[in-house]
Amino acid sequence: PIGKHFYNYYTNIVQTIDTPDLIRSGFLVTYKAYQMADDFSNLKKGANGDYSEKSQYEHFNKEKLYDGVIEEWKKRANDKKTIIFNCNIKHSDETAQAFMDAGIKSYSVTSKTSPADRERYMDEFENGDCMVINNTSILTAGYDFPPIECVILNRATDSLALYLQMIGRGSRIFPGKNNFICLDFGGNHNRHGLWSQPRQWELSAPKKKKKGEAVVKDCPKCEAMLYASAKVCEYCGYEFPIVIKSLKDGVMKEYYEKDMP
């Protein structure tokens, strides 16, 4: 939604160009997303309506999660300029240090970073051998560095606007860049769907999806995130079985798209 109470003042909203249109027109590049399965029921909302920094830090500040981020990055984005969004300053600093400990040059840019250090860190990221830049929100909106080819969501958010802004940092066109990768460790694709999907903007709050209703799913072969309704993986060609249940005898049988009449 555009605003909680805008429907009190306006009756219509002008639908303009959407992300899929910009991708088709060549103004943005598409992406491939991977999401880590995890339980986020322990996260609590703060006064701003989003998940609190405290509950997020308690969830994400685990050695296995730091190791998991580095492992997935090495597996899928080892040679790509990467921006990471973390839940708070301490988390950003510690994630950067975890990469450094693994032999990967990485910096953390936050509100506590001195102007001189910030300038040096950003220069080394954009023009030098630093592959990974960490932040909390400083680089969320307005930061434009087209060579970025990997965005890591090392946090959770219930804000669709923030979700779109963070992932959008990787969508800028650049010579030789056909797409970018998003590694989602915060379950955000389950909340908001694919960054590249069409959206119908409304003045009032959208209807909440039913509990257990899937927004996206992962391909069991290549692990990429897809629309929940996808029948074939657009990346590796895997065909999802169509399961049909016989009401008479309760026997389940798998059918593939090519087998359907």
Predicted segments, located by residue:
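Conserved strand-helix element at the start of the C-terminal RecA-like helicase core
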Residues: 57-102
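Long, largely alpha-helical accessory region at the distal end of helicase-like NTP-driven motors
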Residues: 74, 81, 199-261
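Short, basic/glycine-rich phosphate-binding loops at helix/coil junctions
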Residues: 36-54
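A conserved SF2-helicase RecA2
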Residues: 20-29, 174-228
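SF2 helicase motor core recognition
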Residues: 26, 133-151, 168-172
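Conserved SF2 helicase motif VI
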Residues: 159-180
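Conserved helicase ATPase core of P-loop NTP-dependent helicases/translocases
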Residues: 93-94, 104-140
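Post-DEXD/H (motif II) to motif III coupling segment of the RecA-like Helicase ATP-binding lobe
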Residues: 1-33
